[in-house]
Amino acid sequence: MNHKVAEIEGVGAAQAEKLEKAGIKTVNDLFKMCCEHEGRRTVSETTGIPEVELRRWSHMADLMRVTGIGPEYSELLAAAGVLTVKELGRRIPAHLTETMKEVNTLKNLTKSVPSEKEVTKWVEKAKTMGPNVWESANPIEQKKA
């Protein structure tokens, strides 16, 4: 399953419409078009959306490549300091789980925080993934938070 670009936290209806006019309808599309600086610049010129926003959204899209990470958990991970799959693969699951709990207590981003077991699965999966290759066979689903 692939999420619509409007599901990314921070992408409002107006931005989603601009992105769709530029051919970006899904999280997959956003990641493919904006994972590199050149692509972000082109999309920014086409849509008028600042590159810094496109970069933030592409980071969230990157994290959503990992099974179990959807829009809410990608936002929580970003708030906890994890911006990319590469960074996720370097984390210690127990520490990351605690950081996510602390961040969520302060910011109330999700209804629940994933278990250490779930975070361990994410970290292990992230270690096997390339930085900029979308795994089309990898479902992008998030368990209900």
Descriptions of predicted regions:
Residues 1-145:
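C-terminal extensions
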